[in-house]
Design a protein with these regions (language model features):
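Non-transmembrane alpha-helical segments in soluble domains
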Residues: 7, 68-71, 119, 123, ...
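Residue-level signal for the nucleotide or nucleotide-sugar donor/cofactor binding architecture
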Residues: 65, 117, 158, 183-188, ...
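An extracytoplasmic/periplasmic, membrane-proximal ligand-sensing/linker region
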Residues: 101-105, 186-246
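Glycine-rich "substrate-gating" loop/helix at the edge of Rossmann-like oxidoreductase active sites
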Residues: 112-117, 153
Length: 246
């Protein structure tokens, strides 16, 4: 709703909205033909602010002590392992589908309306694992990370092994930033990019972002646009493989 409003808002230099990848590419791809709403390309990228990789986690009480143990059980017992996500066809679900593709395991997805519901479900034993954003994991107590979808060890939780080192070349993450209506004035774009770059370089700001479980990741509008295109192609490939789009 907010992103549809944003693309129709006045491009006066003052209307700005927060955006979240991969959701701004997933929603238009999956929307039924003719249904109104925004298109990804209508959102003018202003800047990327944070990087938040995907991670597979279990409760500390879980019998699964490693990624390998969980995957082997899920392969031997298709559908028996219940996996939380923050909703069908979200970034969490894309991550789950890719883990299934790379490993041959089969999970039963249990979608929740957000991390505030999925996390208690994991800790309370409603589900066996949670395909999550790392920021959610870092704000939790009582959870154990089994594998993170980054190429190299992630500085905010360096003890969690990467998918890459476990033998699966899978990188999956959310990016969050700012966008504006289309036809945004170039002068306003340049001014805001410079001001936001200064804010994002401030040590106090960076400490606050890390304290929220996120990695500061400022990129200007051009670079953020390239990330959006990259994520669009990755999402399209996964959705096609799953038979969800043509």
């Amino acid at each position: 709703i907010g992103w549809t409003w944003l693309v129709g808002a006045k491009a006066d230099g003052y209307n700005i909205g927060g955006v979240d990848l991969p959701h701004i590419v997933l929603q238009p791809m999956l929307r039924p033909e003719g249904q109104p709403g925004y298109k990804t390309e209508q959102l003018n990228p202003l800047c990327c602010l944070v990087f938040d990789p995907d991670i597979l986690i279990v409760s500390e009480k879980s019998p699964f002590k490693s990624f390998g143990e969980l995957i082997e059980y899920a392969k031997a017992n298709p559908g028996k392992v219940k996996a939380a996500t923050v909703g069908k066809l979200t970034g969490d679900h894309i991550f789950l589908m890719n883990v299934e593709k790379f490993t041959g395991a089969q999970f039963t997805q249990v979608p929740y309306p957000g991390g505030s519901k999925a996390a208690p479900a994991l800790l309370g034993g409603e589900v066996d694992c949670y395909f999550a954003s790392t920021s959610n994991f870092l704000r939790m107590q009582g959870a154990r990370g089994l594998a993170i979808a980054t190429k190299d060890r992630y500085e905010l939780c360096p003890d969690v092994p990467t998918m890459n080192e476990l033998g699966y070349k899978l990188e999956s993450a959310k990016y969050r930033g700012l966008a504006t209506p289309p036809n945004f004035p170039a002068e306003a774009q340049a001014y805001l990019e410079a001001a936001l770059a200064k804010v994002c370089a401030d040590p106090e700001y960076q400490a606050g972002v890390r304290g929220a479980g996120l990695l500061p990741y400022y990129r200007d509008g051009k670079a953020f646009g390239e990330i959006i295109e990259q994520e669009k192609e990755k999402a399209r490939k996964t959705l096609k493989e799953q038979g969800l789009i043509q």
